[in-house]
């Protein structure tokens, strides 16, 4: 599994000629890293003198980030698995009309999954950005740069994931499905833009 590789192994595999891991898996990885950074800043605030008033809030942030981290770590492989299913469908036989129809059904199902996985990553990345805004507002200022790093990592993950959603929607014939996911992707992109601006304004010069 990709998530079980060392950092060096993952980077080497990404740099190779293999199609996976690609941008989608890397978006999930960046979102997982953003969750870890966000949780770290919350932990550096919890129980510290002078932050008693926000202790409960920071514990809630830490718990939410801790819950998202393993999900996003699993998405590293889910994204690559979804792409593998697209490739598998492309390789299906198409000599007869029946084979062509079966191949088309398999491709449509694979493309839908390949759009749904990054959409989930984008949702979680935007959620992490909201947590990041909270820690930049209330958290330990000595770790503000770490909090900002988390927000920016989540921002990159959200944008990359949204792009991947849109790319896969271009191959899907179900207009109702594509319209729904496109609206959701647009909403998440706008929300990420807003949260980035709000979060970074909280950084002290």
Identify the residue ranges that each predicted region occupies:
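A structural-propensity feature for long, helix-poor, extended segments
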Residues: 49-88, 188, 195
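A conserved active-site cap/scaffold subdomain adjacent to cofactor or substrate pockets
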Residues: 37-44
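Amphipathic alpha-helical interface segments
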Residues: 79, 83-152, 156
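Polytopic transmembrane helical bundles with strong interfacial aromatic enrichment
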Residues: 2-5, 120, 127, 131, ...
């Amino acid at each position: 599994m990709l998530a079980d590789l060392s950092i060096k192994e993952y980077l080497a595999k990404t740099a190779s000629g293999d199609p996976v891991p690609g941008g989608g898996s890397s978006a999930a990885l960046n979102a997982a890293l953003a969750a870890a950074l966000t949780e770290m800043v919350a932990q550096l605030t919890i129980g510290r003198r002078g932050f008693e008033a926000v202790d409960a809030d920071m514990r809630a942030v830490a718990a939410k980030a801790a819950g998202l981290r393993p999900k996003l770590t699993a998405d590293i492989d889910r994204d690559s698995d979804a792409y593998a299913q697209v490739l598998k469908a492309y390789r299906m036989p198409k000599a007869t009309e029946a084979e062509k129809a079966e191949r088309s059904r398999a491709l449509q199902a694979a493309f839908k999954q390949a759009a749904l996985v990054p959409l989930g990553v984008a949702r979680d990345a935007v959620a992490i950005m909201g947590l990041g805004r909270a820690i930049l507002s209330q958290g330990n200022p000595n770790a503000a740069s770490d909090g900002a790093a988390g927000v920016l990592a989540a921002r990159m993950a959200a944008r990359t994931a949204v792009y991947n959603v849109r790319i896969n929607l271009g191959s899907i014939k179900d207009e109702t499905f594509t319209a729904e996911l496109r609206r959701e992707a647009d909403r998440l992109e706008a929300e990420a833009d807003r949260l980035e601006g709000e979060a970074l304004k909280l950084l002290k010069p």
